[in-house]
């Protein structure tokens, strides 16, 4: 069934509730690479509830997961994550219940031989006070599903990366089984676990979830710039440019200008850039120098 543009852009979902526990918060942190050294107290605060448990800001991408685009006409097995944007209105609680509303913002037709670029937005608030918590915008690229008559103009311009050597770099090696761990957050797409399916759609092995790479980039910023202070991040935006294979090493290059941290991620083993045009927005009180 081809994509129906008018149906697609009319999609809305309101009042979607999501309850999560401190177990979910710790699982997310572990699944993006936090806590590799269990003796390092800085990361232990994200995976051990002895102190007030810290929350990784990009966990919002998991909490915002709503099946808004289910049965929209594209081939689910060929979908790639293109972009992810996040605005944190206040730090995520370690547990709680959320109410989320989601909508399709736009769908760009990149041509029948290319695909469709679809943007959705999700806003979440807490049930305790009904105050905004975060807003996420997600862009997916449905390969081979173009030619449906959607918008043909340019998609939003990316964040520019400074034209100078990076101020700092952070190296994080992913685990061979990291996709198996990350999928427990709720993304059961078989592309990340089924070797036969991965080969059928053009990958040598199952790929790491784009949002896992996204979380790993956030870990790099927390570690290198924020001194592990999760409350210092108020925005986190990326463009995905290539997949990561589990077990590869992600190097995050960072540039800091005031409260804006620009970053890009590359795979050490293949010398491939996997995240471009990254932008992390910090609170005004978090303008320290990269470590």
Residue positions per predicted region:
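HotDog/MaoC-like acyl-thioester-processing domains
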Residues: 1-14, 81-170, 240, 244-247, ...
């Amino acid at each position: 069934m081809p994509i129906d543009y008018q149906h697609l852009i009319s999609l809305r979902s309101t009042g979607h509730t999501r309850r999560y526990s401190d177990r979910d918060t710790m699982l997310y942190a572990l699944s993006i690479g936090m806590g590799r050294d269990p003796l390092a107290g800085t990361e232990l605060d994200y995976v051990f509830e002895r102190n007030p448990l810290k929350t990784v800001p990009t966990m919002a991408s998991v909490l915002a997961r709503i099946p808004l685009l289910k049965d929209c006409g594209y081939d689910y097995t060929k979908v790639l994550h293109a972009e992810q944007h996040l605005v944190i209105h206040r730090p995520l609680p370690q547990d709680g219940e959320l109410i989320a509303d989601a909508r399709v913002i736009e769908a760009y037709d990149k041509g029948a031989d290319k695909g469709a670029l679809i943007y959705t937005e999700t806003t979440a608030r807490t049930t305790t006070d009904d105050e905004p918590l975060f807003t996420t915008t997600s862009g997916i690229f449905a390969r081979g599903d173009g030619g449906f008559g959607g918008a043909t103009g340019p998609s939003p311009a990316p964040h520019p990366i400074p034209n100078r050597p990076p101020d700092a770099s952070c190296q994080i090696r992913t685990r061979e089984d990291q996709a198996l761990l990350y999928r427990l957050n709720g993304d059961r797409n078989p592309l990340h676990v089924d070797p036969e399916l991965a080969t059928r759609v053009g990958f040598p092995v199952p790929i790491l979830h784009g949002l896992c790479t996204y979380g790993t980039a956030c870990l790099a910023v927390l570690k290198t710039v924020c001194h592990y202070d999760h409350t210092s991040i108020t925005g986190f935006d990326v463009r995905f440019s290539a997949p990561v294979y589990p077990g590869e090493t992600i190097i995050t290059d960072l540039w800091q200008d005031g409260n804006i941290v620009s970053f890009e991620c590359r795979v050490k083993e293949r010398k491939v850039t996997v995240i471009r045009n990254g932008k992390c927005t910090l609170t005004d009180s978090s303008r320290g120098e990269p470590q």
